[in-house]
Structures are given as structure tokens and as C-alpha cells.
């Protein structure tokens, strides 16, 4: 009776099983070790066993990818041909759609998906990094406050901008090649009169006068 409920299929191999393993990765352990000889830049020829290698050949399209959401549920049918990772890596998990939409997650802290801070998606303000942003708090970009490097302010930082943990501000040097133009009083008064006439005309149109 036990042989009927739990049959031993290894005793009856089929001739087409090697073809299924080669083309569709059939009956291969998904947790099998990664082949150390395989180089995705060269291809299957880099491995002595080629396409018949019992170990996993990680292709180039799988490098630095996110985890397959279908694989997490056991529903992925692509096996090794899937363009997403088939491994549990918290840093490469897909983004939680519920958290991205609502700002909180009902499954937290047990949620398997990645919770990304919405502010991290906002690009930094170039004007603020230069030293001053005219929009202030109304700026749609992110103002990142950093501690100024005193060595850089004094004249030289041996670590440089990339290695130093503190801020190296950009100093904006105005273009002095073009001559400065000073407006005359007549131009200023003419502009004021035009603005006053425009306000008076709008008041007449709106029936305020």
C-alpha cells in the first residue's frame, strides 16, 4: 500500500528526462549550489559540464535583480529562465504596494516586501546643495541638512568630496564678464504706473469700482 501512496519514481527513468532538465530545468533542486566555474559573460562553455551541469548557472540577467513575487508564493513557472531572483533576500525584495500607496502597512513588521521611505524617492535640491534655495520650505525637492566640513571651509580636506562624511558645499561664482545695468528712475516709475493701471482695469471689469 505504501508503494501506491508514495511511489518511488527514481526506479523508472524516462528517456526524455535529460531533455526536460536541459530545456525546462525539470526536476532540479531550486536550492542546489551555484556553479563556481560558470561565467555568465562567457556562457555555458565556461563550465566543463555545460548545460548538463547539476549546479545552478546564474545568468547575467539575474544580476542585481529583485526577488520574484510569484516565486515567493510558489507560483513561478519560469524556473531558471525567470528574469527575477529565486532567493529570499530582504534587500532585493519587491516594494510593498500597500505601503507605497497609504504610507503604512497592515502586515508590518512581518511584511515580506520592502518598505521604502517616500522621501527617499524625492530628488535632492540642487540649489540647496549650492548653499541657498529661493523656494525655501515650499520647494518640491528634498533639502538634506549636512554638517559642513571645517577642513574644507578652512581651505583643504585630505579626504576629498567622495570619501569625507561631511558636506563640501559648492561655491557659486557669479559671471562678472557681462556689465551690470542699473535701471533709471523713469523705467521704475513707468512700471509702477502700468501695474496701477492694470489693477484699476481689473477692478472696473469685476465691478469693484
Curated annotation (Swiss-Prot):
GO terms for molecular function: RNA binding; zinc ion binding. InterPro entries: CPSF4/Yth1, Znf_CCCH, Znf_CCCH_sf. Keywords: Metal-binding, mRNA processing, Nucleus, Repeat, RNA-binding, Zinc, Zinc-finger. It comes from the Eukaryota. This is mRNA 3'-end-processing protein YTH1. GO terms for biological process: mRNA processing. A zinc finger (C3H1-type) spans 29-60, 62-89, 90-118, 119-146, 148-171. It is found in: Nucleus. Belongs to the CPSF4/YTH1 family. SMART domains: ZnF_C3H1. The keyword Ribosomal protein does not apply. One of its GO terms (cellular component) is cytosol. Component of the cleavage factor I (CF I) involved in pre-mRNA 3'-end processing.
Amino acid at each position: 500500500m505504501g508503494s501506491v501512496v508514495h511511489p518511488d519514481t527514481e526506479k523508472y527513468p524516462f528517456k526524455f528526462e535529460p531533455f526536460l532538465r536541459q530545456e525546462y530545468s525539470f526536476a532540479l533542486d531550486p536550492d542546489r549550489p551555484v556553479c563556481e566555474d560558470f561565467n555568465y559573460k562567457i556562457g555555458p562553455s565556461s563550465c566543463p559540464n555545460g548545460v548538463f551541469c547539476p549546479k545552478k548557472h546564474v545568468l547575467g540577467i539575474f544580476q542585481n535583480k529583485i526577488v520574484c513575487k510569484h516565486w515567493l508564493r510558489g507560483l513561478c513557472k519560469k524556473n531558471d529562465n525567470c528574469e527575477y531572483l529565486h532567493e529570499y533576500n530582504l534587500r532585493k525584495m519587491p516594494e510593498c504596494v500597500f505601503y507605497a500607496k497609504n504610507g503604512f502597512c497592515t502586515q508590518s513588521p512581518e511584511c515580506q516586501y520592502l518598505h521604502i521611505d517616500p522621501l527617499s524617492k524625492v530628488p535632492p535640491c540642487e540649489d540647496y546643495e549650492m548653499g541657498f534655495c529661493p523656494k525655501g520650505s515650499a520647494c518640491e525637492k528634498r533639502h538634506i541638512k549636512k554638517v559642513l566640513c571645517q577642513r574644507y571651509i578652512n581651505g583643504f580636506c585630505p579626504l576629498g568630496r567622495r570619501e569625507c562624511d561631511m558636506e563640501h558645499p559648492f561655491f557659486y561664482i557669479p559671471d562678472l564678464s557681462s556689465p551690470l545695468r542699473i535701471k533709471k528712475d523713469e523705467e521704475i516709475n513707468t512700471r509702477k504706473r502700468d501695474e496701477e493701471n492694470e489693477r484699476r482695469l481689473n477692478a472696473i471689469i469685476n465691478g469693484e469700482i
